[in-house]
Each structure stands twice: as structure tokens, then as C-alpha cells.
């Protein structure tokens, strides 16, 4: 008979980085008695969640997708951002068979090439350099009509920073002698991931039919008009630039976001014949390309196929007869399931999942606690009943409220997290369980931008905390990275790590 599991809980505080600076630091400004006590009494340190340590370009801030891939894989995962950038640099991008086939088909029929994606240098969902390369590819393949549908950022970049990006694309089209910006809209509409189809329909109708509340002669003019309406980049309303550039049958549409979670919904509207979440006025039959595979179930080709990861933590636990729970609210559910499992949609044997709906508010500063208390209720219940060997939870608050740029809300968010962590650690103490507390990347520790004085709404490259909660005589070694977390969990579970995991336990004997 097997012993009753005493769970090992991995608590991922999304967007919860470490900074010594008090300026705009919601964590240091908050009252967090539980975390303060854990830092004083439990083995803890800092680990890296950015740049080359997570498979991103040197100096690039981490993000939730990348962070969870590394956390679950137990090895540094070469990221799509890096793959695409390298392909452009090596020239392979311009021969990519999937993109070239779609463009050539459109060009051969005298049709247009539509390039859409997040236009910024944020590097989280996309990079403007990739959109420049796509425009160059279209011209090289003979396209005469090239239209850019620009989604504006202001979330992974400063709130009002899109002008330079729009000017870059204008300069690119001028240099190439072809192409223009056709529409601009904030990512709030085009890149929803919470089934808010009213937002997505606004973006779809703008791109497909040039249906827009506002018109402007240039992207920059449209942006300045939005600022005059007090709309930051993220929230810029549907704006048509110049003459209508509708999407017609036979056109090529290339979505240049490399990150999947905020590209799925708009993609589904374009390509799913049985799409029912809102009524499309038209569904043009286009040659659609996803830059990467946004979901296996989406009926469209991807330019960069997903690489498979063998023996990620979830798979290895399942193969060794261990049970696991994955739990998060809507905003981060994909991260604690799909991304943590190395890009796999289906649960592993013995893996259960709980999705708690995120609150239906326009922005999460209006409800900084989000659904964290409800998530915690489920975890405490699972711990008390000792249902699982391993529980993996994501708390979205630090990241989602951090993105609002509103300090007071961010303080409330992290104070709520402190209460939740306290409830989990108290429940674990009763049953003899253990926990690891960490984060996927920074955000909420920097709510103001020192250089501009604007709200800081983006992620950071700061290290993230790593705390062991338990009774073993252990200490945290120096130099840990996110890829070391899964091997650390296996170490605590008394399991050998698989050879595919190149990370090393962060915990060593005292």
C-alpha cells in the first residue's frame, strides 16, 4: 500500500520579481507578513527568469509563456523569439516554405498580402523587426499590395510608445517602395485571451472590412488622435488608415505574433468554418499563416512548427505513477497547463486541472484580488484531503495588476497574495507537506518608469524569489535559473531526474 501523499506545492507568483529599489515597488510598499516571515525563517534566494537563462536573447525580459516552459521542462528552452530572429538573420526566414507558399499563391492571383501582429519592440508576443522582415519577404516574392494591420502595445512597452514603431514601418514601406499601414488598434481588442468576443469582433471587422470608429491619413496621425481621446496604446480604438484595405478571397494573411495565447482567438475567427462566438459579416477564404502553432486544433499552417519536449515534469511524474493538480484562473490557465507541459494541450495520466474563471472586469486594477481567494480555497481543500502528490498553481495578480500601472491596485494585489500563501503554508504544515514559492518573471516590483516618469506596465529583467517551505535542513545555492525548478521538485520527491532535464536542484544540504 502506498503512503498517503503529502503534497509538494509549486506556487508560481506571476510577475513577482525582486528589486532592492523602493521607487514604484509594490512589493516593498505592501504589508506582507507571511512572505516576510518565510524570508526570515526558510531557505531562500534569487533565481534568474530572463535573457539567455530562459532561452531568450541576452538582456530580454522574461514573460509568462517562456517562464512556464522553462519551469516545467527542467531545461533551458530555446524560445520562438530567438528561433525567428535567428532565421531572419541567417536568411532562412525569406525561404520559409509555409509563408512563401501563402504569399506566392496570393501574388499569383494578383491578390494582397496582409501582415498583422503586435507592432512593438517588447519581444513578449512579437517583435517589430519580424514585421519588417515579413514586409521585405512580401516584396521579394513580388507582392504589389501589402497591408499592415498594427496592434499597438503599451503593456510590454511604455503606455505611449507606439509612435516610433509606426514610423519604423512607414520608413520600411518607403524604402521598399510598396506597402502601407492599413489599420491600427490596441492589443486590448485584437489580442484578447479571455473569450471577450466583443473586443475580438471589433478587431476582426476592422481588419476584414475596414469597419472603424475613426479614420486617419497616417498611422501616426491616428495614434495622436487616440492620445487626444486619452487612449493609451493598448486601448487605441479601431482606426482605419487611408483608403479601405479589405481582406478578400485569395489574399494572404500572416499573423506575426510568435506567442500563442493571445493570437488564438483572432486566428479562430479567420479560419474556423464553424466559428459561432459571434456572427461574422464575412469570412474571406484566405491563405492564412500562423507564425508559430497557436494550437494544434486550429486548422491553419504554422511557419515555425512546435518542437516537442520529452520528459517534461508533468510527463515524468505521470510515467512514475505520481498524481498532480494544475490550477489557475482563466488569465494564466494556459500557462500552468499548455506551457508548463511543454506545449501539450492534453493532461497527462493522473493529472487533474481546475480552472477558476477570472473576474469579468475591464481591467484588473478594478479587482486586484482577481480570483486568488477562490483558487486558494481549492488548493487548501486538495491539501487537506491529500489528493495529489504535486500541486502546481499560478497566481495571476502580480502580473495582471502590474500591467495596469496603478500602484495602489498593485499593492492590494500582492497583499492578497500574501494572505493566500499564508493559507497554503498553514494547510501544508498540518499534513507535513512542502512548498516551493517562485515566479516566472518580474513586473509588480517596478510600477513606475524612472526614465520617463510614466507608469511602468511591462515585465522586468529582475531576478525572482525562490523559497523552500518545509522542515528539511537545506539551503539555496547561488546561480539558479527557472530551468532548475523541476529538478529541485524531483529532488524533494526523492526521484532521479531524467537525462533530458539539464537543470540542477537549487536546494543543497546545509
Swiss-Prot record:
<comment type="similarity">
    <text>Belongs to the BPG-independent phosphoglycerate mutase family.</text>
</comment>
<dbReference type="InterPro" id="IPR006124">
    <property type="entry name" value="Metalloenzyme"/>
</dbReference>
<dbReference type="GO" id="GO:0004619">
    <property type="term" value="F:phosphoglycerate mutase activity"/>
</dbReference>
<feature type="binding site">
    <location>
        <begin position="259"/>
        <end position="262"/>
    </location>
    <ligand>
        <name>substrate</name>
    </ligand>
</feature>
<dbReference type="GO" id="GO:0030145">
    <property type="term" value="F:manganese ion binding"/>
</dbReference>
<dbReference type="InterPro" id="IPR011258">
    <property type="entry name" value="BPG-indep_PGM_N"/>
</dbReference>
<feature type="binding site">
    <location>
        <position position="441"/>
    </location>
    <ligand>
        <name>Mn(2+) 2</name>
    </ligand>
</feature>
<feature type="active site" description="Phosphoserine intermediate">
    <location>
        <position position="64"/>
    </location>
</feature>
<feature type="binding site">
    <location>
        <position position="14"/>
    </location>
    <ligand>
        <name>Mn(2+) 2</name>
    </ligand>
</feature>
<feature type="binding site">
    <location>
        <position position="399"/>
    </location>
    <ligand>
        <name>Mn(2+) 1</name>
    </ligand>
</feature>
<dbReference type="Pfam" id="PF06415">
    <property type="entry name" value="iPGM_N"/>
</dbReference>
<comment type="subunit">
    <text>Monomer.</text>
</comment>
<feature type="binding site">
    <location>
        <position position="193"/>
    </location>
    <ligand>
        <name>substrate</name>
    </ligand>
</feature>
<keyword id="KW-0464">Manganese</keyword>
<feature type="binding site">
    <location>
        <position position="125"/>
    </location>
    <ligand>
        <name>substrate</name>
    </ligand>
</feature>
<dbReference type="GO" id="GO:0005829">
    <property type="term" value="C:cytosol"/>
</dbReference>
<feature type="binding site">
    <location>
        <begin position="155"/>
        <end position="156"/>
    </location>
    <ligand>
        <name>substrate</name>
    </ligand>
</feature>
<dbReference type="GO" id="GO:0006007">
    <property type="term" value="P:glucose catabolic process"/>
</dbReference>
<dbReference type="GO" id="GO:0006096">
    <property type="term" value="P:glycolytic process"/>
</dbReference>
<dbReference type="Pfam" id="PF01676">
    <property type="entry name" value="Metalloenzyme"/>
</dbReference>
<feature type="binding site">
    <location>
        <position position="459"/>
    </location>
    <ligand>
        <name>Mn(2+) 1</name>
    </ligand>
</feature>
<keyword id="KW-0413">Isomerase</keyword>
<keyword id="KW-0479">Metal-binding</keyword>
<dbReference type="InterPro" id="IPR036646">
    <property type="entry name" value="PGAM_B_sf"/>
</dbReference>
<comment type="pathway">
    <text>Carbohydrate degradation; glycolysis; pyruvate from D-glyceraldehyde 3-phosphate: step 3/5.</text>
</comment>
<feature type="binding site">
    <location>
        <position position="187"/>
    </location>
    <ligand>
        <name>substrate</name>
    </ligand>
</feature>
<feature type="binding site">
    <location>
        <position position="403"/>
    </location>
    <ligand>
        <name>Mn(2+) 1</name>
    </ligand>
</feature>
<feature type="binding site">
    <location>
        <position position="332"/>
    </location>
    <ligand>
        <name>substrate</name>
    </ligand>
</feature>
<feature type="binding site">
    <location>
        <position position="64"/>
    </location>
    <ligand>
        <name>Mn(2+) 2</name>
    </ligand>
</feature>
<feature type="binding site">
    <location>
        <position position="440"/>
    </location>
    <ligand>
        <name>Mn(2+) 2</name>
    </ligand>
</feature>
<dbReference type="InterPro" id="IPR017850">
    <property type="entry name" value="Alkaline_phosphatase_core_sf"/>
</dbReference>
<dbReference type="InterPro" id="IPR005995">
    <property type="entry name" value="Pgm_bpd_ind"/>
</dbReference>
<comment type="function">
    <text>Catalyzes the interconversion of 2-phosphoglycerate and 3-phosphoglycerate.</text>
</comment>
<protein>
    <recommendedName>
        <fullName>2,3-bisphosphoglycerate-independent phosphoglycerate mutase</fullName>
        <ecNumber>5.4.2.12</ecNumber>
    </recommendedName>
</protein>
<keyword id="KW-0324">Glycolysis</keyword>
Amino acid at each position: 500500500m502506498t503512503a498517503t501523499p503529502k503534497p509538494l506545492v509549486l506556487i508560481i507568483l506571476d510577475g513577482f520579481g525582486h528589486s532592492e529599489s523602493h521607487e514604484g515597488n509594490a512589493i516593498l510598499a505592501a504589508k506582507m507578513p507571511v512572505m516576510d516571515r518565510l524570508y526570515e525563517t526558510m531557505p531562500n534566494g534569487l533565481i534568474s527568469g530572463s535573457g539567455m537563462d530562459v532561452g531568450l536573447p541576452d538582456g530580454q525580459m522574461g514573460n509568462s509563456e517562456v517562464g512556464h516552459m522553462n519551469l516545467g521542462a527542467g531545461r533551458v528552452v530555446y524560445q520562438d523569439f530567438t528561433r525567428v530572429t535567428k532565421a531572419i538573420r541567417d536568411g532562412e526566414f525569406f525561404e520559409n516554405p509555409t509563408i512563401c507558399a501563402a504569399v506566392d499563391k496570393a501574388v499569383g492571383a494578383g491578390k494582397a498580402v496582409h501582415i498583422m501582429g503586435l507592432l512593438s519592440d517588447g519581444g513578449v508576443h512579437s517583435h517589430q523587426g519580424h514585421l519588417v522582415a515579413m514586409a521585405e519577404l512580401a516584396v521579394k516574392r513580388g507582392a504589389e499590395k501589402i497591408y499592415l494591420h498594427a496592434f499597438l502595445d503599451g503593456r510590454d512597452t511604455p503606455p505611449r510608445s507606439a509612435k516610433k514603431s509606426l514610423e519604423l514601418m512607414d520608413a520600411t514601406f518607403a524604402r521598399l517602395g510598396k506597402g502601407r499601414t492599413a489599420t491600427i488598434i490596441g492589443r486590448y481588442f485584437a489580442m484578447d485571451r479571455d473569450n471577450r468576443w466583443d473586443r475580438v469582433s471589433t478587431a476582426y471587422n476592422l481588419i476584414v472590412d475596414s469597419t472603424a470608429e475613426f479614420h486617419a491619413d497616417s498611422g501616426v496621425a491616428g495614434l495622436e488622435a487616440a492620445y487626444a481621446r486619452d487612449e493609451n496604446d493598448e486601448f487605441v480604438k479601431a482606426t482605419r488608415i487611408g483608403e479601405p484595405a479589405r481582406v478578400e478571397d485569395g489574399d494572404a494573411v500572416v499573423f506575426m505574433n510568435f506567442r500563442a495565447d493571445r493570437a488564438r482567438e483572432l486566428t479562430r475567427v479567420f479560419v474556423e468554418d464553424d466559428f459561432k462566438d459571434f456572427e461574422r459579416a464575412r469570412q474571406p477564404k484566405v491563405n492564412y499563416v500562423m507564425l508559430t502553432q497557436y494550437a494544434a486544433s486550429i486548422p491553419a499552417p504554422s511557419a515555425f512548427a512546435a518542437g516537442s519536449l520529452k520528459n517534461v515534469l508533468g510527463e515524468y511524474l505521470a510515467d512514475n505513477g505520481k498524481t498532480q493538480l494544475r490550477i489557475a484562473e482563466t488569465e494564466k490557465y494556459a500557462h500552468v497547463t499548455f506551457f508548463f507541459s511543454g506545449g501539450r494541450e492534453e493532461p497527462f495520466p493522473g493529472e487533474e486541472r481546475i480552472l477558476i474563471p477570472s473576474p469579468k472586469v475591464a481591467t484588473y486594477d478594478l479587482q486586484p484580488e482577481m480570483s486568488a481567494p477562490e483558487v486558494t480555497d481549492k488548493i487548501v481543500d486538495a491539501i487537506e484531503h491529500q489528493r495529489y502528490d504535486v500541486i502546481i498553481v499560478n497566481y495571476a495578480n502580480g502580473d495582471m495588476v502590474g500591467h495596469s500601472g496603478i500602484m495602489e491596485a498593485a499593492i492590494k494585489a500582492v497583499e492578497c497574495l500574501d494572505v493566500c500563501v499564508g493559507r497554503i503554508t498553514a494547510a501544508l504544515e498540518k499534513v507535513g507537506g512542502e512548498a516551493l514559492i517562485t515566479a516566472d518573471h518580474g513586473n509588480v516590483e517596478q510600477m513606475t518608469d524612472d526614465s520617463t516618469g510614466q507608469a511602468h506596465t511591462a515585465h522586468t529583467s529582475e531576478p525572482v524569489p525562490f523559497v523552500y517551505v518545509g522542515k528539511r535542513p537545506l539551503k539555496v545555492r547561488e546561480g539558479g535559473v527557472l530551468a532548475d525548478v523541476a529538478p529541485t521538485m524531483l529532488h524533494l520527491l526523492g526521484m532521479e531526474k531524467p537525462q533530458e532535464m539539464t537543470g540542477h536542484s537549487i536546494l543543497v544540504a546545509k
